[in-house]
Amino acid sequence: MSCNFTVNKYNDIHEIRIKGKARKDWEQWVLLTSDRHWDNPKSDRLLQTEHLKLAKERNAIIIDNGDLLCVMQGKYDPRGSKSGIRPEHNVDHYLDKVIDDAANYFAPYGENFAFLVVGNHEASVSKRCETNISQRFADQLKLKCPASQIHVGGITGYIRLRFDIDTTHCSYLID
């Protein structure tokens, strides 16, 4: 089942336009997450997988509000600690490995991803390593799941959910 939404950007507002039918049983699920820190050894991947599978089953739109990745163990991060690295990520090209593994992990749910906010962890890496971790992840996810419409936003901004139900339109702003 494909997701029935599109994502567009207007200045600092990302709009998720959802199409539906005026039926008594119509509903749209949204999985709203933040601070997954997916690559951290303490991250609860079993719970994340459970939520992602449920989102796919419900045809939910996935919005991640930042810190999808921890990525604090890089060379230039003063908060880093080698004990905070999963064994499979303890390699020379640490950031590349985390991005590739994350894209593989989230690819089965890529079609449901609408929006990814840059969290303070990703922003710190961008500042110190001169690379946009969030955009690199989104690009890799799109390569693995071409149907993904994932958009990357900044640390601040707005998300508007616009519902197009037959000829009726209504919207809700998330700020």
Report residues per predicted region:
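His/acidic metal-ligating clusters that form di-metal
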Residues: 115, 139-175
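Core catalytic region of metal-dependent phosphoesterases/phosphodiesterases
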Residues: 17-29, 33, 38-151
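Residue-identity detector for threonine
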Residues: 6, 33, 49, 131, ...
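Short, solvent-exposed coil/turn segments
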Residues: 9, 25-27, 169
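Short glycine- and acidic-rich boundary segments immediately preceding or forming the N-terminal edge
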Residues: 1-22
